[in-house]
Amino acid sequence: MEAKVEEKEPEPVENAGPDAPVRLTPMMEQYIEIKAANVDSLLFYRMGDFYELFFDDAVAASAALGITLTKRGKHLGEDIPMCGVPVHAADDYLQKLIAKGYRVAVCEQVEDPAEAKKRGSKSVVKRDVIRLVTPGTLTEEKLLDPAQANFLMAMGRTRGDGALALAWIDISTGTFRVAETTPDRLFADIMRVDPRELVVADSAFHDEELRPVFDLIGKAVTPQPATLFDSAAAQTRIQHYFNVATLDGFGQFSRPELSAISGAIAYIEKTQISERPPLMRPEREHEGGTLFIDPATRASLELARTMSGNRDGSLLKAIDRTVTGGGARLLAERLTAPLTSPKEIALRLDSVSWCLSEQTLCEALRLELKGVPDMPRALSRLAVGRGGPRDLGALACGFEAAGGIASLLDGALLPDELAAAREAIEKMPAGFAAHLDRALADELPLLKRDGGFVREGYNSELDEMRALRDQSRRVIAGLQADYIEETGIKSLKIKHNNVLGYFIEVTANNSGAMTDTDEAKSRFIHRQTMANAMRFTTTELAELESKIANAADRALSIELAIFEELTAEAVAHADSIRAAASALSVFDVSTALAVLAEERGYCRPHVDDSLSFNIVAGRHPVVEQALRRQAANPFVANDCDLSPQRDGGDGAIWLLTGPNMGGKSTFLRQNALIAILAQMGSFVPAGSAHIGVVDRLFSRVGASDDLARGRSTFMVEMVETAAILNQAGEHSLVILDEIGRGTATFDGLSIAWAAVEYLHEKNRCRALFATHFHEMTALSEKLERLSNVTMRVKEWDNDVIFLHEVAKGAADRSYGVQVARLAGLPEAVVNRARDVLHQLEAGETSGKADRLIDDLPLFSVMLQQEKPKPQIQAKDSELANAVAAISPDELTPREALDLIYKLKELAGKA
């Protein structure tokens, strides 16, 4: 965005009388006219070196940005609010506004003030909106997270049958995908992609069946005219955008898919105005190709973000060892959309295995990868006119790193996925890479208007202009020496003043050499005669003067022309550049997952089409990493075998009982995460893993309410459980934690009981079901594919030690009172709870409720004095000190025996 001189604002017409309303200036009239066409956006109105905002826009922006609200002129008798942001810092302010959910229309001066004056002294410089900045259409580096895709999504729908499809585009990288969906899958499919913005037709936005989904998504939904989604006009729109005569090479798309594609492209055309970001051809995703994970499961498993919205603490953060922005985005994409094809999963696992077997080579690859900039995003900025010299430099650096990687891989025997990636890297535009290397300077400015980004020696005229601009004195001195040699006048000087400019001056006595012959007169043109000197010029000197005066402007003009030439060449090679960049991301992800596997001791899973689910010594990847970081006790690994009994497994459902704080929820989550990691193509935190492909993953773990929609925690739990029971199939994996809590005990037990029976008999899926309803363990006698397992604990002197080990069998207690004590509840409350528990367990509540109250007065604990803690006697202290001084690992067997006798002696004295 280059600065332009602000034109002088024409004055408003004089009032006709004292009561006449104040007229707006022509500039403000222009603002109101442009704003009327962009009512849903804040209008950044260019005035000189600032973007100004007026009226309600100014009030909203000043509050959102924390900038001063001032005023300028009046309208209808009221001051016009105004605020502004400097053009050079506009990206910083746009970032804040977009984050707060605003859309911004950027209005630029589209003519020079001098041109406006030619139309009359009161003419206003022409302005127009050149771009709409929305969350889903960002390209600027400052506005984007390098590790996260920035998708714009459009929903298409056909009239009549109401069939649905989604198309999503990241204009910062050119990624373009499309897939069909259904109303019951719509929210899950949207959340899998996690778009920054969702555009839908007005009619669909107000559809009663779909509106609840849009309400959940909130501000990210942007309704648009239904004409943008016309599937009948989609073919023409696609052909026009991609500049092709036919769509034969694009594949076949359904009508709802065409509607979605049309809506996405139309919205890009609408927001980018005259620019056309280069996009890949839309790639169709087939239903069932990826693991279906519903939104509740995605949130509770904290795949990409924690429940509080942070990246730290998520599975993605725990496994990310990538070193490039493209690699980080590819890793996130694979994690959020695991595959369901064992063959495709094996291809990815082969890549990781190869990297583990070639660690020295892979270390060298990662060093090269660290030098790879974000080539796709640099290319997109260049294509839409928002790029700078450093974006060209990013391409050059990427080509250099790609060349280094290709050299490292030369002759290597690669698995299929990496072999294809190497081939794409080798097809990068080597000629263009060499061109960039010749053209670009080593140090590049941020903005092209600053110049200095073209290498010396690349363009002879540019070198000359720079020499004139930077070394004019040396050039003049050289010309002066030439004239001295030509005339033989050693006192000849070339001087400069504001009247004559550059001129040649000689003494009157020496002037004859310049005037005596016709040849000399034609060569040296007389300018001025002084008392003791004469002044001349030459055609050469006049041209040099003109060149010096215009050298800076000409130098910048040449550089800008070279920039446009290089940009056009980059866009022409967009497909091969993107292919090479994608290939580099594949190498980044594969080597990163190998580093993770080596670092954490992960194993290669065996994934097939069976119903097996046998995890040996599995671990929770996030919790394990947190424990290591805290230097705490190592994570306790556990087995999980949900394989069919015919395959030697324990059955399809594990009913897990055990204490609070025992690790049930962690165990449930870790097995779901292991399945996700395996199917995304990663090694897994286990001793071994055999997983039959999971087609749908459901979880109900953790408690949350939805007060905004009038749903209690229990209601949310029931809705999510209903979705699981209605959708899970034989190849699904279900994890359920404490279903039935939040209501009366027998109600909850009944619901949990019936749910397990339904999972076993109807869904017939693999499932982990954790519960505190110990009565349910009797189901193992009735349901042949159900096994009881429990979290082991050890009791010691009224305390409970959580072993975090899963073992066969059933728990008969939940140790809630002990956990309450550990949590710091007052001792009197803990004691009272223990007494009540004993009464309840003795079955003495079958009578009236007041019997328990009479026997154990509820509030009597408040009147009781806390028992004083026993004082440690001297002898007790001596015994305690002796025990505390023991270093068990340093004792020999003989020393240990002697110590036992000593401790027994001290205990006897006590």
Curated annotation (Swiss-Prot):
Alphabetized Pfam families for the sequence: MutS_I, MutS_II, MutS_III, MutS_IV, MutS_V
Family annotation (SUPFAM superfamilies): DNA repair protein MutS, domain I, DNA repair protein MutS, domain II, DNA repair protein MutS, domain III, P-loop containing nucleoside triphosphate hydrolases
InterPro entries (alphabetical): DNA_mismatch_repair_MutS (IPR005748), DNA_mismatch_repair_MutS-lik_N (IPR007695), DNA_mismatch_repair_MutS/MSH (IPR017261), DNA_mismatch_repair_MutS_C (IPR000432), DNA_mismatch_repair_MutS_clamp (IPR007861), DNA_mismatch_repair_MutS_core (IPR007696), DNA_mismatch_repair_MutS_N (IPR016151), DNA_mismatch_repair_MutS_sf (IPR036187)
Compositionally biased tracts (Basic and acidic residues): 1-11
Any GO MF annotation of the entry: ATP binding
Matching SMART domains: MUTSac, MUTSd
Record keyword Translocase present: no
Region feature Disordered, mapped onto this chain: 1-21
Keywords: ATP-binding, DNA damage, DNA repair, DNA-binding, Nucleotide-binding
GO biological process, one term: mismatch repair
Gene3D superfamilies: 1.10.1420.10, 6.10.140.430, DNA repair protein MutS, domain I, MutS, connector domain, P-loop containing nucleotide triphosphate hydrolases
Presence of the UniProt keyword DNA damage in the record: yes
List of residues binding ATP: G658, P659, N660, M661, G662, G663, K664, S665
Domain of life: Bacteria
An example Gene Ontology CC term for this record: cytosol
Known function: This protein is involved in the repair of mismatches in DNA. It is possible that it carries out the mismatch recognition step. This protein has a weak ATPase activity.
Recorded family membership: Belongs to the DNA mismatch repair MutS family.
NCBIfam families xrefs: mutS1, PRK05399.1
Protein name: DNA mismatch repair protein MutS
Chain's gene name: mutS
